[in-house]
Amino acid sequence: MRSFRSSILLVLLSLITVLNATRARSETESKVHIVYLGEKKHHDPEFVTESHHQMLASLLGSKKDADDSMVYSYRHGFSGFAAKLTKSQAKKIADLPEVVHVIPDGFHELATTRTWEYLGLSSANPKNLLNDTNMGDQVIIGVIDTGVWPESESFNDNGVGPIPRKWKGGCESGENFRSTDCNRKLIGAKYFINGFLAENKGFNTTESRDYISARDFDGHGTHVASIAGGSFVPNVSYKGLAGGTLRGGAPRARIAMYKACWFHEELKGVTCSDSDIMKAIDEAIHDGVDVLSISLVGQIPLNSETDIRDEFATGLFHAVAKGIVVVCAGGNDGPAAQTVVNIAPWILTVAATTLDRSFPTPITLGNNKVILGQATYTGPELGLTSLVYPENARNNNETFSGVCESLNLNPNYTMAMKVVLCFTASRTNAAISRAASFVKAAGGLGLIISRNPVYTLSPCNDDFPCVAVDYELGTDILSYIRSTRSPVVKIQRSRTLSGQPVGTKVVNFSSRGPNSMSPAILKPDIAAPGVRILAATSPNDTLNVGGFAMLSGTSMATPVISGVIALLKALHPEWSPAAFRSAIVTTAWRTDPFGEQIFAEGSSRKVSDPFDYGGGIVNPEKAAEPGLIYDMGPQDYILYLCSAGYNDSSISQLVGQITVCSNPKPSVLDVNLPSITIPNLKDEVTLTRTVTNVGLVDSVYKVSVEPPLGVRVVVTPETLVFNSKTISVSFTVRVSTTHKINTGYYFGSLTWTDSVHNVVIPLSVRTQILQNYYDEN
């Protein structure tokens, strides 16, 4: 017994020693930290950088140690730096009065032929926004992503004029990338890898498959850049599907690529260091971009480290303060509620919808019944072939009949020379791809997948007949199999169907509101097509076909909005970033272009609401002439930060002016957003909005309200009169509830109309009679 106790004691002592050593190592190990100092105090960037080195040298003891520690100096749009610091060093520097905050480096992830005709921007129409703005010429779209493939035809500069005089950026040479690879279309390319390298010490730059330059290995950056501002490329298709002339939203706008995302084989994908992203933002501000398109997402914000503690949002605040419109992806974590990211009120956050385009794939059963599934199958027609449904696959005494994920559990079941039907509840394409691989390996000739219809992405390679149907159609096929002695099936090539009767939906993966941290700030703001978008890519992309690929995600919807903003910027160069947001939100489609309701995919399909698509689907032509705008400036953002409880000192350093928040603190409901979201209405609340006339000088607008269910909405005044002396007018909105219990959100709208313009903002109201109550039922 004594020996046993001695052994246990030795084990415990060893464990304590290991834990102490681990703790000591974590205290002394240097990791990248971002030191944020707020608005820069000096206009000379060299002076700003020198002040950063001096601050670091005073902490570390020598200039050499400071130089070795420094990763980046942020010196153009704002002041700060990234440096390798221990925890104790980070704490010491955070205590300095001139430091707003210090946080460890984080990471972000990566989140077309028919698109523009669908949105009413046909190049064949001489009288539309596209041609009124010379297709966005002189507007510069900055893209922060995985880089660019400069040889892609989407970046040809045929017919493009001289580089805009305001451009102060450049084209940085590197691995397989020359400064001469830029042209009048692709006017800038830079790369930022120091933060990534500091956090991935084992990364070998000489053996990496990625290019240590602005050249794109992954293809994602090339894809999104070409969606936003790609040039005209005729006769493009994806193996014969989705054919037509390919172009970006603003085909004569200029592209500047800032590569801050890197392929890492050990991580099996692409990752983006926040310190690299911050440097990309800093450089983009300096270079003179007009629009920043960022198809990157961080974690769903479920803690307090947001906004002023979120370096990504902080950097973008400085971009917006300099007049740059920032467009970001809302994320691909839908359809669950409160999954939307990039939620700061100065960011334009984008949801994804389908197009009015599909790829029906005829499945003909032996009884001559034709079922139209969905696929991107471009191989030869599969003639009449035996059709089977695997019965009684077993594992640990459980039966998995016909489950796609269990096809490998019954290797004795013959699939050779047959088409297999299976069912799945999986929302991942990886599981279906594995099922297809097993069927192919077993000698099968095709696969029909019955799955929840919300999961729209193509699950298989295009050279293998792999067709998706919903559960109802899958059950019809199964009934045929079980009622026929020798069931057979024929599968034809996929076709392209555009326009009616294909409806538009908010796609299942698109992240949803409400805003998890600031529920009174509506997110997402707007929606755009983001499913199976055909655009340029890198030759290394596994989905590459002739330099192009069809990809899906809010990553793809984001540059659609960026392209539209570029056109609007060319038309209204004097507008603020908030004005552009207001214009596209208040004029958005709340039905699809054919007047049909827009549904949202999820566990059950429902009519879309503002938490699915914000204001609706972007309507570029209407956004060009919105009539009224809900404008915002620094004071509105200060009001937001004060209402969120940030202290005067932090806000002052962020905005570069002395700020004293009122006591009591202001209401976030008064932030001049083109939406009204009330998350906790108990009795009655009154809020204020201000609209600015950007239409005819002498205008009269009258209000109409579609109130949320059980909610009274009173607007004062009911009529707004504008003239040469009265450009902006404020109004109040009194909202009260008739509900006697806590409710979910109900939705409505508030519209100002002058018989020409309809300026619509969404209303979202939740009654909370019992405040601060978590309802687990």
UniProtKB/Swiss-Prot annotation:
One of its GO terms (biological process) is proteolysis. Its EC number is 3.4.21.-. Induction: By hydrogen peroxide and infection with the bacterial pathogen Pseudomonas syringae pv. tomato strain DC3000. It is an enzyme of class 3 (hydrolase). The active site is at 145 (charge relay system), 220 (charge relay system), 555 (charge relay system). It comes from the Eukaryota. Residues 1-24 form the signal peptide. Serine protease that plays a role in the control of the establishment of immune priming and systemic induced resistance. Belongs to the peptidase S8 family. This is Subtilisin-like protease SBT3.3. It comes from Arabidopsis thaliana (Mouse-ear cress). The gene is SBT3.3.
